[in-house]
């Protein structure tokens, strides 16, 4: 029986993964080694019971008593805290979904790779912060990383069986978010609720706001660089409001391979779960005649400066991605809290990158996880200072 673990089980990606696993037979088809979640211990316990999980872990130690009570008599072991989540990744599983949001997903993802199995990676921050280290760890341990972002899953599928030296360009698409038709002045005064109103995808608060600011697409550009190894000049993003084409790959013979699919994360998750084969996934089938038109346009970097910052990070490499992601997370925290404006987020990130760029770690290829975490700490501190300064000026 195939074994699996789901890290970030109670988030949107985790819920979709759980849905697909249950549809494929649940505990009759899979041995669930570990499930992890956050504060929603009732849902985590419900999932653990349904899958007969061996271990359920909440990231918050104060939630452990509630989780223990919810799983009493189930036979499922319980634990709490970030260290417990990392230790859960030490339990070997054939297939692990890494869906913890943010840099917190890096440590368990790295530890899971050391078992030489398959890691379905929805946590884009892992590649952004420590891409070279992550890919090297996978190679050294004979592990496989499958991208679960819809764009990178699309590129992965388009490249299947292809000679990558013949790839001229990789194009990932962006919906443009809720502000694609707003003026710069309108965007400047937007609220958290408005930033969360994504036109095509159903996502959590943080990723919805990242999408609105195009920081999500900026992370994905860096992720493309780190996962596939293409030079920055071969990677670009275009705005595609319909969210039907997820990525395109252009080849040296002039041909372009495009991957089309519904705006449903279960497609990419299902591909990773069924890989190396394919299996039925309960998503809507495209009716191209009904869709009728697919449009594309260049993104406006004045309104979405995160894309420009991403190109600078792709060129610098080293630990610049760790600094970028850390600063972005702090800037997002401050926007959600109402301390800074929407457009201030990019300014905070740029100021933080400038502040830490002189540090010897900034351009260094990471050799240890500790170096990644050290740069993460430096950038968070710099971003806090930049955000606090802007808050005082409001």
Swiss-Prot record:
Database matches in Pfam families: DXP_redisom_C, DXP_reductoisom, DXPR_C
Cofactor dependence: Mg(2+); Mn(2+)
Record SUPFAM superfamilies: 1-deoxy-D-xylulose-5-phosphate reductoisomerase, C-terminal domain, Glyceraldehyde-3-phosphate dehydrogenase-like, C-terminal domain, NAD(P)-binding Rossmann-fold domains
Metal-binding listed as a keyword: yes
Listed GO biological process terms: isopentenyl diphosphate biosynthetic process, methylerythritol 4-phosphate pathway involved in terpenoid biosynthetic process
Record: residues binding 1-deoxy-D-xylulose 5-phosphate: 124, 150-151, 175, 198, 211, 216-217, 220
Enzyme class: oxidoreductase
E.C. number(s) listed in UniProt: 1.1.1.267
PANTHER family for this protein: 1-DEOXY-D-XYLULOSE 5-PHOSPHATE REDUCTOISOMERASE (PTHR30525), 1-DEOXY-D-XYLULOSE 5-PHOSPHATE REDUCTOISOMERASE, CHLOROPLASTIC (PTHR30525:SF0)
Family classification: Belongs to the DXR family.
Classification via NCBIfam families: Dxr
Protein known as: 1-deoxy-D-xylulose 5-phosphate reductoisomerase
Gene behind this protein: dxr
